[in-house]
Amino acid sequence: MQNRSSSPDSSSAGNTHFGFQSVPEGDKANKVAEVFHSVAARYDVMNDLMSAGLHRVWKAFTIGRANVRPGMKVLDIAGGTGDLARAFAKRAGPSGEVWLTDINDSMLRVGRDRLTDGGLILPLAVCDAEKLPFPDQYFDRVSVAFGLRNMTHKDRALAEMRRVLKPGGKLLVLEFSRVAKPLAPAYDWYSFNVLPWLGKKVANDEASYRYLAESIRMHPDQDTLADMMRAVGLDRVQYFNLTAGVAALHEGVRLG
């Protein structure tokens, strides 16, 4: 199995991709929701399997690059189990405001419960990243970790993220990306053979894990995503390859 390339939102008229399948655009959100309802309770296990535990290191790098300071307003989109939101809240302090959002209520409940267990109560919202329910120029930081690749219209979501950023605010996108070519055969073998097998054994859910592997291959590569961020009006766009490109952190700043 070779890496497949994709256009920014590779789709034909009225269709988009769900993993390697072509589906009507209106169906993708429901199909993705089914996957994450299925994996919500074991989401951290899923990320450990997909990244060999390295997602924790990548998130720590993202938190450092975010440079959240006391009093800042931060939006964590597709926040899952709340890892980033928890770290941002500690840095923003009582004078700050950190929102945890996700389109999937099962994921958001897991995040809420884990934050509460850790003594944190944060504002939560079930919302679509393509239609954020926040005012213009409200947040100092916006983050999305391992969520952008599941969105139907990535360009619309990125435009919304820019809209809610204050001038000088930063967007951080952490996502599985295009691995360095020498590692691609081994990585593909792991993704399409080992990962679904582990999903079946650990979570009794081979299909969801196969979709997640396919969704990584269909996600835009590093340079394409950087161009998409520039196209919606973000400046100072750059990215950092993590673990030879298994993941990448993209950054962009709203200047005006």
From Swiss-Prot:
PANTHER family according to UniProt: 2-METHOXY-6-POLYPRENYL-1,4-BENZOQUINOL METHYLASE, MITOCHONDRIAL, METHYLTRANSFERASE
This protein's pathway: Quinol/quinone metabolism; menaquinone biosynthesis; menaquinol from 1,4-dihydroxy-2-naphthoate: step 2/2; Cofactor biosynthesis; ubiquinone biosynthesis
Gene3D superfamilies membership: Vaccinia Virus protein VP39
Organism: Bordetella avium (strain 197N)
Keyword Ubl conjugation: no
InterPro entries: SAM-dependent_MTases_sf, UbiE/COQ5_MeTrFase, UbiE/COQ5_MeTrFase_CS
Family per similarity comment: Belongs to the class I-like SAM-binding methyltransferase superfamily. MenG/UbiE family.
Segments of this protein annotated with the region Disordered: 1-24
Keywords, in A-Z order: Menaquinone biosynthesis, Methyltransferase, S-adenosyl-L-methionine, Transferase, Ubiquinone biosynthesis
Annotated S-adenosyl-L-methionine binding sites: T81, D102, D128, A129
Protein name per Swiss-Prot or TrEMBL: Ubiquinone/menaquinone biosynthesis C-methyltransferase UbiE
GO molecular function, one term: 2-methoxy-6-polyprenyl-1,4-benzoquinol methyltransferase activity
Record EC number: 2.1.1.163, 2.1.1.201
Single biological process term from Gene Ontology: methylation
Annotated Polar residues bias: 1-19
Pfam families assigned to the protein according to its UniProt record, in alphabetical order: Ubie_methyltran
Known catalytic reactions: a 2-demethylmenaquinol + S-adenosyl-L-methionine = a menaquinol + S-adenosyl-L-homocysteine + H(+); a 2-methoxy-6-(all-trans-polyprenyl)benzene-1,4-diol + S-adenosyl-L-methionine = a 5-methoxy-2-methyl-3-(all-trans-polyprenyl)benzene-1,4-diol + S-adenosyl-L-homocysteine + H(+)
Function text: Methyltransferase required for the conversion of demethylmenaquinol (DMKH2) to menaquinol (MKH2) and the conversion of 2-polyprenyl-6-methoxy-1,4-benzoquinol (DDMQH2) to 2-polyprenyl-3-methyl-6-methoxy-1,4-benzoquinol (DMQH2).
Family annotation (CDD domains): AdoMet_MTases
